């Protein structure tokens, strides 16, 4: 590798809004970053995920135009 052309690789601290803090190595210029969600508070990883099914495009079409096809 050429000397002097690569960014500095250093430890960076990440703090989540839930209070979880962890460190990782990165080329970021910042010493710390703030996260909105992490694996400790994200609904998918905590098992609190809800599936919201509002119906698809086909259901919406059938609701609007389904009566027209049954009149034949």
Curated annotation (Swiss-Prot):
Cofactor note: Binds 1 zinc ion per subunit.
Superkingdom: Bacteria
Keywords per UniProt: Metal-binding, Ribonucleoprotein, Ribosomal protein, RNA-binding, rRNA-binding, Zinc
Gene Ontology MF term list: metal ion binding; rRNA binding; structural constituent of ribosome
Presence of keyword Ribonucleoprotein: yes
Gene3D superfamilies: Ribosomal protein L31 (4.10.830.30)
Binding site for Zn(2+): 16, 18, 38, 41
One GO-annotated biological process of the protein: translation
Entry's Gene Ontology cellular component terms: ribonucleoprotein complex; ribosome
Cofactor needs: Zn(2+)
KW Transit peptide (keyword) present: no
SUPFAM superfamilies: L28p-like
Described function: Binds the 23S rRNA.
Family according to the record: Belongs to the bacterial ribosomal protein bL31 family. Type A subfamily.
Subunit structure: Part of the 50S ribosomal subunit.
Protein name from the UniProt record: Large ribosomal subunit protein bL31
Organism: Vibrio atlanticus (strain LGP32)
């Amino acid at each position: 590798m050429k000397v002097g052309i690569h960014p500095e690789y250093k430890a960076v601290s990440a703090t989540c809004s839930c209070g979880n803090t962890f460190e990782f190595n990165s080329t970021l210029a910042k010493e710390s970053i703030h996260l909105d969600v992490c694996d400790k508070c994200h609904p998918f990883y905590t098992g609190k995920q809800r599936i919201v099914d509002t119906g698809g495009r086909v259901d919406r079409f059938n609701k609007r135009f389904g009566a027209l096809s049954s009149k034949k």
